[in-house]
């Protein structure tokens, strides 16, 4: 693969197979052979990967005294460069770039939703607006016009309301001269196809994480390919975890070979990250996805062993206390399906005073809307005012969010006025609300009455769980999520407040201790960090000595729509489609293959799982279980026997087809 120079190539790489190192060596080899840097383009999936690859490539170039390195870009940054050049040549109209999720974009979505549904209202169902947002994004990335949706029989089942909304969306973008990041990709492809634009002549195009590309990104690669261009793509179908935004496993499992003739296949099937037990259980889980059969991971014989442990009903606090005794100097990741699941470990780490960081945009718990609501309610209950959070830099945002989450009925402009007034006079919140809010309005009267009553409730107990119960009984959490029109955000907020209840019922935390953690969390020196908190999606491409997976109740992952009610947190099961389950299984595969030394999975107590292991089964349960179905598929008992067989080939074990295949791959 390193010496491959002519013809297209598809590299299928398992986790930890050293694909980045191999790609660096290949690019370095091309440069050493005299291939001009400007004739090579390397496309990465995201900014972090782009920066990391560029840094490593520069180090390699310096080692061999190479004067320059090729362009290493993300798809969007490269497409934006083409669009800007098109604008300079007057081939494309100048438009303002608007970020999806920005207030301007959210307002545009609202307008389209109202138009599509032929209503005049200020209320938007969160699930409906997110459905519209995802549909619009995918339609734009598939280059579909409103006419396509109306005239093509393939789209006859799409709701007419969504078709009207999409038509309005396209019209508004043109009217306001706006473009999104999705549009940048489409416009770049259209520019290349126009034959009016001089496409850069590239001899080598390398695309990393190809399993995550969508239709328009694939079209961009095709558009950049000329007779002299050699394209190499690298990826792993088992790590395709972005289907919800257009990625498809078949781009790497068939489409590339269809579009790029005479493709040579390279398989990097040996991992240098983890030991045989983890390789085996990962193979066992992912084998349930029928499109994964071409990929089979084995560990390099010199890899150290990786232990896989399933903990039923174990408290995270207990595991961390034990981990501190055993792995004082190891790196550890606590990984969950959603950001809401990470609330518990963050508070536990604060209680234990262990150095950690959160790998997400919201660096502090109080920056989560539902947690800031809980925090301010507790301040009002204990202190009667908000003076305790004076040191907080984003106080005005906290006040605004507090008012929005409580869902006072306010006339236009009053939200800002009320926010500003309370921000200036934190000690007089009740009088300000009484003065500026129409308390005669029924909902406002109920909310104000509840706020006044919670102060007297605080004397009943100094435990945070007791106060939470009071807030919940008074309905102060009922309107959580209304501050966001995006369903994925609102669901996460509902889930977050629900997990706070579980946490406070599990640990005895006083109100003052909880407020100290939420308002003034202990911050740690970056060089001393030993714990990372991240979602499964956020863990991709990373590795740690130890990985702890949490939130593994089957109702929560993968078998739900992530919409818990309050306070009955997880009683909301629904069946996911087969494709959804495949993607969630791939996500689980990504998460477990981040571990080097030890993989811990915390699951609820489940007698069915004990029965499964006793019978040495690895099939997917057909009946409801407590633990996620994916741990049933791990074939953990056989994996342990396999490790003993590898250590001592004379050991006799009962071979299954999968364990025999693994041993054959090792020539044992």
Regions found by a protein language model. Give the residues of each.
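Accessory C-terminal helicase-associated subdomains
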Residues: 388, 392, 433-544, 557-559, ...
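C-terminal accessory regions
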Residues: 553-668
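Conserved helicase core region in the C-terminal RecA-like lobe
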Residues: 72-81, 205-209, 234, 338, ...
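P-loop NTPase Walker
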Residues: 1-90, 280-283, 593
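ATP-hydrolysis module of ASCE/P-loop NTPase motor domains
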Residues: 67-69, 88-177, 405
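Conserved RecA-like helicase ATPase core segment
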Residues: 218-306
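ATPase/helicase motor core of nucleic-acid motors
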Residues: 78, 258, 326-458
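Conserved helicase NTPase motor core
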Residues: 1-18, 71, 156-253, 270, ...
């Amino acid at each position: 693969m390193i010496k491959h120079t002519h013809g297209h190539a598809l590299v299928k790489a398992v986790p930890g197979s050293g694909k980045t190192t191999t790609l660096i060596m290949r690019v370095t080899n091309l440069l050493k052979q005299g291939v001009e840097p400007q004739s090579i383009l390397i496309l990465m999936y995201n900014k972090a990967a782009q920066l990391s690859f560029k840094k490593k490539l520069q180090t390699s170039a310096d080692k061999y005294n190479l004067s320059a390195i090729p362009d290493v870009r993300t798809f969007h940054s490269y497409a934006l460069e083409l669009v800007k050049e098109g604008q300079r040549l007057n081939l494309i109209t100048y438009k303002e770039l608007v970020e999806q999720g920005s207030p301007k974009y959210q307002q545009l979505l609202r307008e389209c939703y109202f138009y599509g549904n032929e209503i005049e209202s200020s209320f938007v169902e969160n699930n409906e607006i997110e459905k519209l947002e995802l549909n619009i994004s995918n339609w734009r990335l598939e280059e579909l016009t409103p006419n396509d949706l109306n005239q093509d029989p393939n789209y006859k089942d799409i709701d007419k309301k969504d078709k009207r909304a999409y038509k309005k969306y396209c019209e508004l973008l043109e009217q306001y001269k706006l473009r999104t990041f999705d549009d940048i990709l489409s416009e770049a492809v259209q520019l290349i196809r126009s034959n009016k634009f001089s496409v850069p002549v590239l001899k080598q195009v390398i695309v990393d994480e190809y399993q995550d590309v969508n239709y328009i990104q694939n079209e961009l690669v095709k558009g950049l390919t000329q007779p002299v261009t050699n394209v190499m793509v690298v990826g792993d179908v088992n790590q395709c975890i972005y289907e919800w935004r257009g990625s498809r496993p078949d781009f790497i499992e068939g489409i590339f070979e269809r579009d790029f003739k005479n493709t040579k296949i390279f398989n990097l099937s040996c991992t240098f990250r983890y030991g045989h037990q983890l390789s085996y259980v990962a193979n066992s889980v992912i084998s349930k996805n029928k499109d994964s059969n071409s990929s089979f991971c084995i560990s390099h014989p010199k890899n150290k062993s990786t232990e896989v442990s399933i903990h039923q009903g174990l408290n995270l606090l207990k595991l961390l206390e034990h981990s501190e005794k055993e792995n004082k100097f190891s790196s550890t990741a606590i990984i969950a399906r959603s950001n809401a699941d990470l609330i518990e470990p963050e508070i536990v780490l604060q209680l234990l005073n262990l150095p950690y960081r959160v790998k997400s945009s919201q660096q502090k718990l109080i920056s989560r809307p539902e947690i800031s609501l809980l925090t301010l309610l507790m301040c009002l209950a204990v202190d009667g005012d908000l003076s305790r959070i004076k040191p907080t830099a984003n106080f005005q945002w906290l006040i605004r969010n507090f008012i929005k989450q409580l869902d006072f009925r306010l006339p236009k402009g009053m939200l800002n006025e009320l926010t500003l007034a309370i921000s200036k006079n934190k000690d007089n919140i009740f009088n300000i609300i009484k003065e500026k809010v129409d308390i005669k309005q029924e909902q406002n009267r109920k909310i104000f009455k509840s706020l006044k009553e919670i102060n007297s409730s605080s004397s009943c107990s100094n435990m945070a769980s007791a106060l939470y119960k009071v807030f919940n009984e008074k309905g102060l959490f009922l309107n959580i999520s209304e501050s966001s029109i995006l369903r994925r955000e609102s669901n996460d907020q509902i889930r977050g407040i629900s997990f706070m209840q579980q946490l406070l019922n599990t640990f005895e935390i006083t109100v003052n201790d909880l407020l100290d953690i939420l308002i003034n969390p202990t911050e740690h020196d970056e060089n001393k960090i030993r714990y990372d908190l991240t979602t499964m999606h956020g863990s991709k491409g990373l590795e740690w000595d130890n990985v702890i997976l949490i939130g593994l109740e089957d109702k929560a992952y993968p078998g739900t729509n992530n919409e818990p009610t309050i306070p009955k947190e997880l009683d909301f099961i629904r069946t996911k489609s087969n494709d959804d389950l495949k993607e969630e299984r791939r996500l689980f595969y990504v998460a477990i293959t981040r571990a080097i030394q030890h993989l811990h999975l915390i699951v609820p107590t489940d007698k069915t799982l004990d029965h499964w292991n006793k019978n040495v089964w690895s099939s997917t349960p057909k009946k409801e279980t407590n633990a996620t179905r994916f741990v049933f598929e791990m074939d953990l008992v056989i994996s342990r026997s396999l490790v003993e067989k590898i250590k001592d080939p004379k050991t006799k074990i009962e071979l299954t087809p999968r364990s025999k295949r693994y041993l054959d791959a090792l020539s044992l």
